[in-house]
């Protein structure tokens, strides 16, 4: 069975996400469990995995992957995402990932850390053509003895 160029390139996108995720998991997510959250709406899957969200971190990061079964992903990530915590709304600092277009995208979304670190927060993503924002909720555990 041969693999078409399109299938090979699609697999490369998933490989990039796996690499990004592995790096994030290995570099200091001890502050809390690193669990990927997924949302599927209108045939587009968005997966978000928190990276370094430590209390002493100045920059927080999230691995974000988009996968579409049919349509191109033309989202401008920096314009469509906001971090909400303690009544504050924080726009992303940077997107280090694939540019808009294609059916698969992955990258790292970076924010200036909210200080003091909230007990919980939401990553909200507004996408064109979707009735309401996608919401990814993160709750920090109390690890004190």
Question: What residue ranges belong to the model's regions?
Answer:
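Bacterial N-terminal signal peptides that target proteins for export
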Residues: 9-19
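Short coil-to-beta strand junction motifs in C2/discoidin
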Residues: 74-79
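Short, solvent-exposed, Trp/other aromatic-anchored flexible loops in extracytoplasmic proteins
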Residues: 87-137
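Short beta-strand elements
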Residues: 137-145
């Amino acid at each position: 069975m041969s693999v078409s160029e399109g299938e090979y390139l699609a697999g490369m996108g998933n490989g990039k996400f796996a690499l990004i995720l592995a790096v994030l998991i290995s570099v200091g997510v001890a502050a809390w469990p690193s669990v990927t959250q997924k949302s599927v709406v209108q045939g587009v899957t968005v997966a978000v995995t928190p990276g370094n969200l430590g209390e002493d971190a100045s920059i927080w990061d999230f691995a974000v992957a988009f996968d579409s079964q049919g349509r191109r992903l033309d989202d401008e990530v920096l314009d469509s995402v906001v971090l909400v915590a303690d009544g504050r709304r924080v726009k992303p600092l940077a997107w280090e990932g694939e540019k808009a277009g294609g059916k698969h995208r992955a990258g790292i979304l970076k924010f200036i850390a909210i200080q003091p670190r909230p007990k919980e927060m939401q990553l909200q993503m507004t996408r064109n053509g979707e009735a309401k924002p996608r919401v990814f909720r993160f709750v920090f555990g109390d690890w004190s003895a």
